[in-house]
């Protein structure tokens, strides 16, 4: 079982552009939990920056991003997620979204938390700032 399972107890699969993928597919990767929402102006500004970083580096640096949406209706979620190249926690996992926010002390969005998928260890809590300051990922995965 993946170390992520302790944070995502109700989720066995995540959404992807091609359907669904299992949590187990993230073994060996660094995972960013991206807390965001379509109604959030700073999120709409940061998402393209993160998407560019993702497209340039996710294969070579062996990471994945998982959207943890704070959208309140499913249509907004799907419209927003449709613009993203990464994975997402399914919209119907609202209780998991709430628990993740509490677990990581997320009080505002956008927030990007870095986790070791195998162990569940938190690598960093300031990844949003690091993506902006280090767009080449020279110091990735930016431990706190």
UniProtKB/Swiss-Prot annotation:
Any one cellular-component term (Gene Ontology): nucleus
GO molecular function annotations of the record: thioredoxin-disulfide reductase (NADPH) activity
Disulphide bridges: 40-43
Any Pfam family hit: Thioredoxin_8
Protein name: Tryparedoxin
InterPro entries in UniProt: Thioredoxin-like_fold, Thioredoxin-like_sf, Thioredoxin_CS, Thioredoxin_domain, TryX_NRX_thioredoxin_dom
Gene3D superfamilies given in the database record: Glutaredoxin
Keywords, ordered alphabetically: Disulfide bond, Electron transport, Redox-active center, Transport
Family statement drawn from the similarity comment of this UniProt entry: Belongs to the thioredoxin family.
Gene Ontology biological process: negative regulation of protein ubiquitination; negative regulation of Wnt signaling pathway
Domain Thioredoxin: 2-144
Keyword Transport: yes
Function description: Acts as a thiol-disulfide oxidoreductase. It is spontaneously reduced by trypanothione.
Keyword Transit peptide attributed: no
